[in-house]
Structures are given as C-alpha cells and as structure tokens.
Amino acid sequence: MEEFPGYFELDRSRQHDFLYPLIFRESIYALAHDHGLNRNRSTLFENEVDYDKKYSLIIVKRLITRMYQRNHLIISANGSVQNPFWGHNKNLYSKILSEGFAVIVEIPFSLRVLSSFERKEKDIAKSPTLRSIHSIFPFLEDQFSHLDYLSHVLIPYPIHLEIAVQTLRYWVKDASSLHLLRIFLHEYWNSFSTPKKHITLFLKGNSRFFLFLYNSYVCEYESIFLFIRNQSSHFQSTSSGVFFERILFYVKIDHLVEVFVGTDFLDIRSFFKDPNMHYVRYQGKSILASKDTPLLMNKWKYYLVNLWQYHFSVWSQPGRININQLGKYSLDFLGYFSNVQLKSSVVRNQTLENSFLINNAMKKLETTVPILPLIGSLSRAKFCNALGHPISKPTRTDSSDSDIIDRFVRICRNLSHYHSGSSKKKSLYRIKYILRLSCVKTLARKHKSSVRAFLKRLGSELGDEFLTEEGVVLAVIFPKASGRLYRGRIWYLDIPCINDWVGDAEGSIFTK
C-alpha cells in the first residue's frame, strides 16, 4: 500500500467544503449564476411570492426552515398533510427544494471544474472533437476489430437513500449539509417515487438533483474500477473520467477514496492481467471489451459484483453482466446496432507465369440504424401508423406553412445528422420518406386539398427543403461525387451531447 499513497488521500481542499452556510447566502446563488453553473434556472433567483409559478431563494429558505420544524410536517394516518402550508403543493415544494439543493451542492465541484478548465484550456483547444458523442465510434471501429469478447454491464443504482448520502461523504465534509440532505430525502422520497418505478434517479421533474447523486455514486465506483484496471494492465489508461454529465468530460480522476482496507492489493493486481482491456460507459450501462479468453472476463464480472455488493451495499446478480463473442453479438449502443462482421477482400496476385486470387478475411465494425424502434417512435408521435405509413399531423394545421415545413425539416435533419454513420442507408431513407410525406399530408389537410394536387402545385421546392446536411457537406467536399448516391459512413464531430430521443421510444426530438 505504500506504493500508492496519493491514490488513497482525499484532496485537503475538499475537507473545507462547508455547504450549510451557503444555503442562506444569496450572493452564492448569484455567483453560481454568473459562472454559468445554473443555466436555464434564472427563475430560481427571482424573489416572487407566487409559489405556484416561480422558484425563489426565499421559498427555499422557508421550506428548509419548516423541514426542521417537525410539528409542521405531521402526517395523518390516511396520508393527508394536515398543515395547509404544504397541502396539495407538496410535490411542487419538493421540486423547488431539489433545485435549490442541486445548485448548492454543485458549487464546490463546479468551481474546481472551472479552475481545471483554465489549467487545461490549451489541451482542450487541441482536441475539440473529443466533445462529440460520435467521436467514440471511430475508436470502436479501430479497437473492436481486434477484440474477441464483450461484456455488457448494467450499472446497478443504489436503491437505499443512505447509500447516496454516504457516497457524498467522501466528497463533502460538511455534516450539517449531509444531515439536511438526509432529512430532505426521507421526507420527500414518496413525492419523487411511484409504486411502479423503483429507480427514480432520472425523473424529469427532479433530474438535476438526482443526476448529481447518481454521478457521485458512479464516480466513486469508476475511481476504484479504473484504478484496478490501470494498475493491472500493461498499458496505462489515457481516458478522462466523467463526473458531471457533459460538464466534467475533461477532468482527470486524480483523487481516489480509501477502499482497499484489509485487502492485499498486489494479489488483486496480479489477478487481472490483461494487455488490452477497454471500458466505455453510456446511459447507465458500460461495456468491457477484451482480446483475452472468457476466463478473464468472468474474473472481472465477479469482481464487479463483489465491489457493488460489499462496498456499495448494492445487490447485483451476475446474470446482469453478459459476456458475448463480438462476432456473434449485436450491441444496441447509442442509437445504433453495432456488431463485428467478417469482410472478405480479394487481391489479385500476378506473377510471370501464373495469376491467382487471394481472399483475405478482415473484421469490421458494422453500425446500422434500428429501423423498427424509429418507426415505433414516429408512430407514437403521430407521423405514421404502426405499419410505417405516413399520416398527417392535425395538431399542426393551425401553424403557418413555413412553420410546418421548418418543423419537419428540422426533425429530418436531426435524425439524418445523428444516424449518418449507418452502414446501410436504405432504412434511413425510409424514415426520411415518412417524414416528408407526413409533412405533405399535413399541408394538404390544412389547405383542404389532395396530396397529388398539392405536390403538383408545390413542385420541387419541398424536396430542396429536405436536402439533408450530409448532402450539402458532400457537395462541397466531393463535388464530383455529389451527383450520385453516397453510401459511406459519416461521423460528425460537432455533437457535444446526446438527446433523450437516442434509445428512447418517445424522445424529445419529435417535440422540438
């Protein structure tokens, strides 16, 4: 253990994160707002008295005070709240409090992020394309073709409130704030959760607060896991650790908590010897890929299960971690179906006397668009029926023609932009056809005309509007090839965040 003293010491600055006084400091909220830490939450700083319409610092203060006054929170046997202050607005007040807690608890972390960004500004400027979600796919194309086994891991969530609070103890050394957080979670947990949903970390009404709790849990888990991986591998990891989603992408995990108490670390390190292990996390899941035998993958599998069970008190069955051969498994990853296929390459060898062909088999990562889930999403958004036949949108007939066309064109281009890396473009053309014809039917319904007559009157103008972005880009880069259909894959390096619609049947892309 003497070899790694730096890994098991907390940053001394973290020992002075006293957050409790910040709850009642209006200047702290203004500071957070000025630093851009609370975007799209400007209403939190408006001191209005209309509780049903505005978030305000005054409301947060009052609610925190009443949380400590236990006589105001007496609940009768039938579950109704006796105090008229809470009444039927208890869910609203819990949301307001969660917003206030999220702002405050992010302050010490976010200020360190800003200072880290200033130190690493030059390095970030050299590699701006790493911000893109699509940047992971070229990496997978280069690496997965040389690997044999893949383990798909579903990261378990801490189902007990105390686990989330205890995880924060390693990062926030303020007992008063943690005590207040514990009271808040126990008082309002029923407001957040529903009987049908046991995992409520990503409820839309409280996503910011619970996203912070979830990321703190994942950060500690990955700190331990990546430390073991780096020390057991022949090659040190060069990846950056992620704490806040899309905020701390470039921040290295420099400080780890002490977790190997009473464990012979050298034995653990010698237990996992893999020269080529890769780790990717996305949407509450992670991927482990290796070139070695399934025995090593099983070792990592049971190590993760024991780590979650004994360190985080989170029960995870080994069956939640699947080990598959890359050549026989299709991975549903970030809106794509990805699998490794053997592609034959024929080379003709000519000698002085003979000529013969050499057939070389090469592994290649194929990415395709999941057409059925996309059609299902379009059907639920009323762009087509269950069979994929386009229908009109009656809710849009009150808008102007330009607004209707702009909406459909924006949706089409968003889909084309993200799914441009598909190996098979035919399914993507079908999605474009559904959106284009749905737009025409909506306009024809508005003008009380037939689709044929409306298309004849409109001409080719609508087709030019639906010209996708990759078509414009290719026309500039490859002017000679722009006339014929381009079937290659395009990965855009300007997608900094992933929208909810990727992997979600009822995504926000259809409502924007």
UniProtKB/Swiss-Prot annotation:
GO terms for cellular component: chloroplast. It is found in: Plastid, Chloroplast. One of its GO terms (biological process) is tRNA processing. Its main location: plastid. Keywords: Chloroplast, mRNA processing, Plastid, RNA-binding, tRNA processing. One of its GO terms (molecular function) is RNA binding. Belongs to the intron maturase 2 family. MatK subfamily. Usually encoded in the trnK tRNA gene intron. Probably assists in splicing its own and other chloroplast group II introns. This is Maturase K.
